[in-house]
């Protein structure tokens, strides 16, 4: 079956909206179009960490699973993310997140032997750098500043999820990329 990003986004929003109340509701969708509830967004985030925002992330992360992955593939940008379940976080992260991005980047422009050797070393030894078996928790999956809606310095909600069950510290790491870091 050919991956359809619109269907995937709709399924992801349906899943999240059955459990949480800060993702846009689906108004209508088909394989070519997804119409969701409008969230007013002036991009004006609070100068201090917003508790509603942090509590919402915590609510996402309280939903857990026995395995790492998700019931269907999702996406980040134009990249389809395989979410086939695995019982080990290091394997899931290496096989389903890092390796595909590495292969895509290397196919676009060969990074050379030195960089390829270093990346392959990291991929083969990832279990030495990250926990093997943290509790699989639901993640937004694409949590960056553009997917967090603020209006009038108040948290409104999240958009554009690429959800899967993974290690929640991955999402915290995304938030550290903010300028300035948000947590």
Task: List where the protein language model places each region.
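Active-site Asp-x-Gly
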Residues: 82, 87-94, 103, 135-138, ...
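Residues in soluble alpha-helical coiled-coils and helical-bundle/repeat scaffolds
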Residues: 21, 44, 106, 110, ...
């Amino acid at each position: 079956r050919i991956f359809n990003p619109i269907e995937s986004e709709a399924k992801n929003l349906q899943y999240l909206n059955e459990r949480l109340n800060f993702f846009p509701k689906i108004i209508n969708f088909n394989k070519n179009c997804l119409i969701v509830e409008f969230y007013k967004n002036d991009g004006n985030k609070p100068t201090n960490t917003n508790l509603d925002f942090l509590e919402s992330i915590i609510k996402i992360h309280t939903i857990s699973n026995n395995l790492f992955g998700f019931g269907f593939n999702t996406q980040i940008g134009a990249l389809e993310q395989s979410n086939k379940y695995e019982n080990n976080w290091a394997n899931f992260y290496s096989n389903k997140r890092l390796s595909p991005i590495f292969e895509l980047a290397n196919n676009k422009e060969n990074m050379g032997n030195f960089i390829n050797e270093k990346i392959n070393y990291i991929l083969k030894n990832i279990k030495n750098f990250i926990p093997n078996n943290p509790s699989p928790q639901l993640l937004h999956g694409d949590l960056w500043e553009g997917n967090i809606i603020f209006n009038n310095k108040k948290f409104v909600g999240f958009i554009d999820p690429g959800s899967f069950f993974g290690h929640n510290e991955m999402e915290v790491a995304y938030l550290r990329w903010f300028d300035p870091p948000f947590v």
